[in-house]
């Protein structure tokens, strides 16, 4: 556990961010070193051509057929804070408006339509998950809802809404969070802000509240009926804590505004940028002049397991409240819960950030995984393999590649990259399914600028080796190999959940579930690499699963305890 808030090496590392020339430390055996000339920027969406306003988050749909070059075959779905869901259509290069929300947003608020994630089986069900601010006579909340697009993915059916999760808030927050991302297991990760404004320096009712979903990273497993289950190994497992004092959805607590998050697609390590205080310090004193420069702190955080990341008692490399023991934080007596249900008085141990950042606004990018099997003429080279990329909303062209230790506890190198590529107010930075990088540049609060855009960063060099291949996520790999026989599509069974399957096929496949008597229970069809859930296998017993694709057929014997 990283629990020392007086470790000077952290600050020294953060201050030394530009010690090396761009890309100079990123090498790969058998390939030439990278230069700025190896990368090209393609503008997909721009303010001038497409009349976008306050773009926020994006999600991708790969249209390339197996074996086909993925370049130019990725649809980009994105949200605009003031209420529009839009899509860059890669076939026409046009920007479509799929739907529009009539939102109630305070004048100084950062609330609105924020996060977006496409369902793991989006190809067949056309489900899209959205994070937005909802207000009615009886409810003010952040909603995570599932909607259905039409068959052409050109229109959002507003009547199809299934409210998956509703988080009570006050209206007018400047810290909404809003990031959504599915992992390979079908779990949905959600970054929620602490629902405060900059002057609310000490929010006991949200970030440190174990019984509240604000100021957290949540992990849930959406189900076809619009409800969700709780994955194994969240922070507060059922039965371990006093009833009514914790929420099982919480994976990470003690965050201020986890505005961006990403997941290592293999190890499922969670990384996020936590936006730190800039209006007041933790004791409510104004931060201005020289004090702002010395007190301001951001965090790049990494979690290999659930935990408490300390806010508001700790921020960056600083303890911000006297008398709080990081090994056993206790909510101060007489604290005001502001009408929200109180949680535990004694909190899990506080974990220090892996990278305190004394700059402006921490935005995480992806942990990149090179895939030698991906046919893409624009995918990033293996020089970035397993690197964690980050940027800064307020720092023009500040982009860095972090090298992580094998256990994910330390950053061993931080190298500047893309120094000549315009990262203008980035609010989302992801690796697309084509292996290229995508960046959303914000327009400014209730304003527009010439730099408002969504860009794609293409690699134009010639380093595209066959190895490494994209590794299979750990739990899927453990389930595979001992589960069945035959040459059919690769299939992994995810333990400890509903019957959830990760299928990898070169084309169209079919799945059939039977009981031991041969009675058909369920069937599904899909194409390529997909995640499939079979709700029909709900009770304990032994089942047979038949999988057929272009590779052949195989049968698996499954035991449900």
Positions of the model-derived regions?
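Acidic, Gly/Ser/Thr-rich repeat motifs that build Ca2+-stabilized beta-propeller blades
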Residues: 25-199, 260-272, 276-279, 359-407, ...
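Short, glycine-anchored, charge-dense loop/turn motifs used at functional sites
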Residues: 186, 435, 514-521, 543
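Short beta-strand/loop motifs in extracellular/secreted proteins, especially
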Residues: 397-400, 507-511
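C-terminal tail/sorting-segment detector
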Residues: 523-525, 530, 537-561
